[in-house]
């Protein structure tokens, strides 16, 4: 399994985290890419 940052979950080699924030799709995707993991909106 992937080593994930604290507070993140690993599943099939990828790290995931749920954020309960109200954002538009564009703002949410931007927020995800700004995370330390350089993620994407799923």
From Swiss-Prot:
Protein's job: Binds to the platelet GPIb/IX/V receptor system and inhibits ristocetin-induced platelet aggregation in human platelet-rich plasma. Strongly inhibits platelet aggregation induced by ADP, calcium ionophore, thrombin and collagen. Does not inhibit U46619-induced platelet aggregation.
Q: Which cysteines are joined by disulfide bonds?
A: 4-15
Q: Does the keyword Chloroplast apply?
A: no
Q: Which InterPro entries match?
A: C-type_lectin-like/link_sf, CTDL_fold
Task: Write out the GO MF terms.
Answer: toxin activity
Under what name is this protein listed?
Snaclec lebecetin subunit alpha
The primary location reported for this protein is: secreted
Species source reads Macrovipera lebetinus
